[in-house]
């Protein structure tokens, strides 16, 4: 629809409302580009190769356009579209373009080889890159840091049990462990054989694979391997040689059951793009062409987004609920309710229809937190509610309630409050999907090389602020609950104050770092009752 103009509003707000009205999806949400990481398309294409299902021409051309357009001047590709070149991404993108039909003598591919070969090529890639190459038969499994499935057989009380990891981390290493144990590998083709010859600076047959396990280029060593991790890798390597066959099979059964639970709970969407592809490959290896594979293949396109720079794989199946909740709050802040009523009604319907209404079946067996009443980042079908998404869904609903447009029944709004409360950590803050389960020292065992703070779901200022704001809004809406929520709000406020830096800033983790942190830090304190002359707010304002 086209929003009629109003001379009462500043032109910037006018244009903003017009854009929101014009870009709303028929289902009531706003869909946007959630791309950026450059290693996702290579993982997608690798998955297609392992499935034996090449990309259709339109998908192929879209991927090529995206990858070609983001090559750095030095010939490499970054971890994301704005980063310096990484061996991890550069090798994977090279392989991907070759799989998509680009010849080895292509000028861009020649520049890529000229960059990554002197940096060590696959032997110096971050660990995830080596793993994907191993799946394609372009890297030996002997050169991988072990990913044994037997970790899932450890007593659940131990901090090293995978259930203690941040859910994104454990859901990636879950299928990795199955594929590693099975030494899954794509069918050899002349093209793969040719690529294998192109990406190494030395003959493939002469590589010292055991030495390559701990080799990482400086470009990829964002989180350098600690002595603890190296010791753990050594112990796991020993276990890999000694693991009894019966124990391995039992562990693989446990892992496959956990994969099944994740697939069913997310309608085969999966929590994120990496485990989406890897889970698909697991089932193709376990039951080729079976119903699990077909169910996964149908949802693979959920992760694709076509933009001005080409076709990309997003970091989530969408960001719809998050974007819609903020769009609603932004529209309501203008006061133009009547003018935007049809837009708000559709958005209210989307918010209502995407609240999670029930817990995951046998959630304890799948190591899942409660879900009932929460909102996800994207869609209800995705099945993973998040603390701040629940908070923003609740805030948007309560603001819609004030203008008579909310469609979420009051009992379900209260369930959202209960979901938020269930996620408050002992330190008073809120993490993302779950309570903090493992100790922070687990980060010393981070095996990814290219990512940090992935091992444990810790409290963040953004999540904490959003939850404090939502609880404060509910207290105003339902005064009878104000006493019940007073202590959780105060604990959240204390956490926000504790993590403020000496210069008055907050370090954000889920947006544009300090700008994002300052926005949420100040908003959380104000919602908790801080006055304009509060020292923390004055420091945040630079006064």
Predicted regions and their residues:
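Preference for long, amphipathic alpha-helical scaffolds in soluble/luminal domains
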Residues: 1-543
């Amino acid at each position: 629809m086209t929003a009629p103009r109003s001379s009462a509003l500043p032109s910037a707000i006018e244009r903003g409302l017009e854009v929101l009205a014009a870009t709303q999806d028929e289902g009531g949400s706003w869909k946007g580009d959630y791309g950026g990481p450059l290693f996702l398309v290579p993982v997608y294409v690798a998955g297609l190769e392992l499935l034996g299902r090449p990309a259709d021409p339109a998908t192929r051309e879209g991927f090529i356009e995206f990858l070609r357009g983001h090559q750095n001047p030095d010939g490499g590709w970054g971890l994301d579209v704005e980063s310096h070149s990484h061996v991890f991404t550069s090798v994977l993108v090279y392989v991907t373009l070759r799989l998509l039909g680009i010849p080895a003598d292509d000028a861009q591919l020649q520049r890529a080889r000229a960059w990554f070969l002197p940096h060590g090529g696959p032997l110096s890639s971050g660990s995830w890159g080596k793993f994907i190459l191993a799946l394609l038969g372009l890297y030996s499994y002997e050169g991988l840091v072990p990913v044994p499935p037997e970790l899932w057989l450890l007593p659940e009380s131990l901090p090293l049990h995978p259930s203690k990891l941040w859910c994104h981390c454990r859901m990636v290493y879950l299928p990795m462990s199955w594929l590693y144990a099975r030494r899954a590998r794509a069918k050899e083709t002349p093209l793969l054989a040719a690529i294998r010859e192109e990406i190494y600076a030395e003959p493939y047959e002469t590589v010292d694979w055991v030495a390559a396990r701990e080799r990482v280029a400086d470009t990829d060593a964002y989180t350098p391997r600690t002595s603890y991790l190296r010791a753990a890798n050594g112990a796991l390597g020993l276990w890999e040689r000694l693991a009894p066959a019966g124990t391995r099979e039992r562990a693989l059964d446990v892992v496959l059951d956990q994969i099944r639970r994740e697939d069913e709970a997310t309608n085969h969407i999966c929590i994120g793009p990496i485990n989406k592809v890897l889970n698909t490959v697991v089932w193709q290896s376990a039951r080729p062409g079976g119903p699990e594979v077909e169910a996964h293949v149908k949802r693979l396109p959920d992760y694709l987004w076509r933009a001005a720079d080409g076709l990309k794989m997003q970091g989530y199946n969408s960001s719809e609920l998050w974007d819609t909740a903020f769009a609603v709050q932004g529209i309501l802040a203008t006061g133009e309710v009547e003018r935007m009523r049809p837009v708000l009604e559709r958005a209210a319907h989307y918010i209502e229809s995407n609240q999670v209404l029930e817990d995951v079946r046998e959630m304890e067996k799948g190591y899942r937190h409660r879900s009932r009443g929460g909102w996800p980042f994207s869609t209800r079908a995705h099945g993973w509610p998040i603390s701040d998404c629940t908070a923003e869904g609740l805030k948007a609903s309560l603001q819609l309630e004030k203008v008579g447009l909310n469609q979420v029944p009051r009992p379900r709004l209260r369930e959202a409050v209960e979901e938020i409360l269930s996620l408050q950590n002992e330190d008073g803050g809120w993490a993302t999907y779950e309570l903090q389960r493992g100790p922070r020292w687990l980060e010393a065992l981070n095996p990814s090389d290219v990512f940090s703070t992935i091992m444990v779901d810790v409290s963040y200022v953004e999540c904490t602020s959003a939850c404090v704001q939502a609880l404060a809004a509910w207290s105003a809406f339902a005064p009878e609950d104000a006493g019940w929520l007073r202590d959780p709000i105060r604990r959240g406020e204390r956490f926000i104050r504790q993590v403020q830096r000496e210069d008055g800033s907050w370090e954000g983790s889920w947006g544009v770092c300090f700008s994002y942190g300052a926005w949420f830090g100040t908003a959380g304190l104000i919602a908790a009752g801080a006055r304009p002359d509060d020292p923390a707010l004055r420091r945040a304002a630079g006064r």
